[in-house]
Amino acid sequence: MLDDYEDGYVGTSHYQTFNPQVLRCSKKHKVLHLHGAIDYGFKPFGESNSAWIAPDLIPDLVKYSSYNLASEHSRPQFSANQAGYACQSSSIITGSNKTDKLIAVPFVFYNSEFVNSIIKNPSLLIIGYSFSDFHLNRVIDEVTKLHGLNRRIVIIDSIPDRAITHYVQASC
């Protein structure tokens, strides 16, 4: 178990808020929940996400101290994407139109950190990933281009025949 890690969430109340500066500056191991977590939820009704005059159109996710608290505040929130179509924000990213869902905080920062880590590092540890998300696969594809034969990808998964042959064969 990874005890000493950074995920960018800070605070001591019943929920923590995301601070991208904390994530960026930390020297600890970084845990990026690219598809969310069961202890994420939205702020209690009536609490604002920002100090801006205009309210946020896409609510930030906060991290609750327990799953039970998070589940009380995890109902999907609806807004519109740039094209004007309905977009659902949720504590777990599933289904189609994932790129629309990635603009919620912390996902937008987690994905940015993921891309920057790929650029800087030839090593990648993947745990329990289905390889069915184009936005992540595109970044993983770049590891070989960026790092050539120096790249190391370790995949830990309980399903042995997922779509990893592309990444394994690239080293031959």
Give names to the regions the model predicted.
Residues 90-96:
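Gly-rich Lys/Arg/Thr-decorated short loops/hinges at beta-loop-alpha junctions or inter-strand turns
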Residues 1-90, 102:
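Extended, H/D-rich, highly charged conserved domains that either
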Residues 21, 27, 97-172:
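SIR2/sirtuin-family catalytic core signature
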